[in-house]
Amino acid sequence: MSRLHHQQGGQPSQRMLRVAELVRHAMSELLTRSDINDPALEGKVITVPDVRMSPDLKLATVYVMPLGGENVTEVLAALDRHKKLLRGEIARRVSLRFAPDVRFKADPGFEYSGKIDALLSSPKVKQDLEVQDLELKDSGCAGAPAKTGPAGDGE
């Protein structure tokens, strides 16, 4: 093949992004309706923040996270057990030549946001933010630009 499936820079193609979004919607609807009878999934709200497709559209990597981030490995194992059922349901909802094989992974964004929150609440960062607030108050800037009229006369 002379053409690459990826755009320059390793970015996914528009088709890959479009199919990934269709699969994400179908998967989140399936997990919301709770058609899966598994004790590990009962009463859990599972979010599907991202799906990434392979260039040939035959593999969908579904990133999931249970609400609250609890029992992630248990939820991933339960979804893997019902992979065949979920693949069949996706095939019915998304019209593709081949139903993509489904792989489940924990969403790394949840862990990343936790690290950012911990960093922002650290004593050093709080101290720096307090210093910035004091400097703004001392300089008379409230952080918002002054309103001026069209002639710049304050009205």
UniProtKB/Swiss-Prot annotation:
Keywords assigned by UniProt, alphabetized: Cytoplasm, Ribosome biogenesis
The record's GO CC annotations read: cytosol
Q: Which cysteines are joined by disulfide bonds?
A: none
Q: Which Pfam families match?
A: RBFA
Listed InterPro entries: KH_dom-like_a/b, RbfA, RbfA_dom_sf, Ribosome-bd_factorA_CS
One GO BP annotation here?
Answer: maturation of SSU-rRNA
GO terms assigned for molecular function: ribosomal small subunit binding
Tell me the first and last residues of the signal peptide: none
List localization entries: Cytoplasm
The primary site where this protein sits is cytoplasm
Keyword match Cytoplasm: yes
**Record flagged with keyword Cytoplasm:** yes
> What protein family is recorded?
Belongs to the RbfA family.
Primary role: One of several proteins that assist in the late maturation steps of the functional core of the 30S ribosomal subunit. Associates with free 30S ribosomal subunits (but not with 30S subunits that are part of 70S ribosomes or polysomes). Required for efficient processing of 16S rRNA. May interact with the 5'-terminal helix region of 16S rRNA.
Per UniProt, subunit arrangement is: Monomer. Binds 30S ribosomal subunits, but not 50S ribosomal subunits or 70S ribosomes.
Q: What is the protein name for this chain?
A: Ribosome-binding factor A
Phylogenetic placement of the source organism:
Bacteria, Pseudomonadati, Pseudomonadota, Alphaproteobacteria, Hyphomicrobiales
User: Gene that codes for this?
Assistant: rbfA
